[in-house]
């Protein structure tokens, strides 16, 4: 069995978010619940996984022993889910502020574009890792 923490800890080595740190300090259970939500998003995206990704949400673990590469891929999908959430939050804040200054608007647009570029690069990284993962077991596929 692979614990959720193993995947989330790997993902958190990439993410530096003061809000997550503060949530962890204030309420570890809420922190875990938030992280588990992002992990469920990651599980839904990892459709190519050769193992069953069934899990026990109470025990916070997968039923299977996931490989190092499977853990890595899920952690990167977790990071993508986090980035998408951050990007959506930033876009919503900008809309609510209704900033009239062209400089600020352009800066916000550039910031949004950069965040989108990061997400695109993460997706490319996950795609490469997934292709490597599938090639490891190429003999199992019927041609």
Set out the residue ranges of the language-model regions:
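Eukaryotic calmodulin/EF-hand partner-binding IQ helices, IQ-like basic amphipathic helices, and related
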Residues: 41, 99, 103, 118-122
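Polybasic, proline/glycine-rich intrinsically disordered low-complexity segments
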Residues: 106-141
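Short, surface-exposed, charge-dense and proline/glycine-enriched linear segments
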Residues: 52-64, 80-91, 117-130
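Conserved short "hinge" loops at termini or chain/domain junctions
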Residues: 1-66, 128-143
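Weak global preference for isoleucine
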Residues: 7, 23, 73, 80, ...
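Amphipathic protein-protein interaction modules
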Residues: 68-115
């Amino acid at each position: 069995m692979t614990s959720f923490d193993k995947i989330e800890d790997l993902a958190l080595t990439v993410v530096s978010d003061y809000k997550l740190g503060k949530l962890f300090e204030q309420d570890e259970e809420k922190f875990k619940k938030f992280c588990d939500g992002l992990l469920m998003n990651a599980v839904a995206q990892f459709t190519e996984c050769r193992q069953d990704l069934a899990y026990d949400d109470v025990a916070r673990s997968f039923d299977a022993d996931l490989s190092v590469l499977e853990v890595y891929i899920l952690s990167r999908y977790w990071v993508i889910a986090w980035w998408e959430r951050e990007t959506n939050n930033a876009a919503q804040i900008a809309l609510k502020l209704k900033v009239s200054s062209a400089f600020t608007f352009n800066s916000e647009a550039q910031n949004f574009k950069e965040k989108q570029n990061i997400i695109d690069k993460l997706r490319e990284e996950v795609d490469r890792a997934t292709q490597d993962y599938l090639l490891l077991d190429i003999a199992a596929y019927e041609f």
